[in-house]
């Protein structure tokens, strides 16, 4: 089994690359989706978050109020670290159950922080200019520039990814160009 990690800061444009990985025979595990599974109503992950951030992160029906959690979790680097420390063990356990294919791509913003990078044969980091990231985050999450800035500021700097990734891809331009480069990298890794 070959496991490839795909990571990078929020808004860098990792998600456009997953279809390429699937086309090349990789099972793609979207760790953001797994994270949502980890905090469904009455889950251990959600209970852990409530213990740390308080019951006001819940909607009236007992489900997670994502915006309320985001306001608290991204208000400071300490709170972001607390979010990751609380939730990552739950996410990691779910991800490990999904790694059941010859070729696996873990699409994971917190791949390195979770320790999942240690299970990877290679870690590909996707980076992009801050302005591009702001635009993508606002559009994707339907939030203000101020809220997008909070999310970027709460995340790891580019240097973190430069130090911890095997390969870096810069996603500032043409999506066809980046997907072609990504396909070349994955093909090379598969052939090792």
Residue ranges and their predicted role:
Residues 1-3:
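Pre-Walker A (Motif I) flank of P-loop NTPase domains
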Residues 6:
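Hydrophobic anchor at the beta1->P-loop junction of P-loop NTPases
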Residues 10:
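The conserved Walker
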Residues 15:
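Walker A/P-loop
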Residues 23-31, 44:
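Post-Walker A helix-loop "phosphate-sensing" segment adjacent to the P-loop in P-loop NTPases
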Residues 32, 83, 105, 148, ...:
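Residue-level signal for inorganic ion chemistry
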Residues 33-102:
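ATP-dependent small-molecule kinase phosphotransfer cores
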Residues 96-97, 101-103, 117-126, 131-143, ...:
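NTP-dependent small-molecule kinase module
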């Amino acid at each position: 089994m070959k496991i490839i990690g795909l990571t990078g800061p929020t808004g860098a444009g990792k998600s456009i690359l997953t279809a390429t990985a699937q086309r090349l025979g990789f099972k793609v595990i979207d760790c953001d989706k797994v994270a949502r599974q980890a905090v469904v109503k009455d889950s251990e992950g959600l209970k852990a978050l409530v213990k740390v951030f308080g019951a006001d992160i819940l909607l009236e029906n007992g489900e997670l109020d994502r915006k309320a959690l985001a306001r608290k979790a991204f208000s400071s680097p300490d709170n972001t670290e607390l979010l990751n420390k609380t939730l990552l063990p739950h996410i990691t356990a779910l991800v490990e159950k999904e790694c059941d294919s010859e070729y696996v791509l873990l699409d994971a913003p917190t791949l390195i922080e979770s320790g999942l990078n240690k299970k990877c044969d290679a870690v590909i980091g996707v980076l992009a200019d801050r302005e591009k990231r702001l635009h993508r985050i606002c559009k994707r999450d339907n939030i203000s520039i101020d809220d997008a800035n909070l999310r970027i500021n709460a995340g790891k700097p580019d240097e973190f990814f430069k130090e911890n990734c095997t390969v870096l891809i810069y996603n500032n331009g043409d999506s066809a160009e980046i997907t072609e480069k990504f396909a070349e990298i994955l093909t090379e890794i598969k052939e090792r």
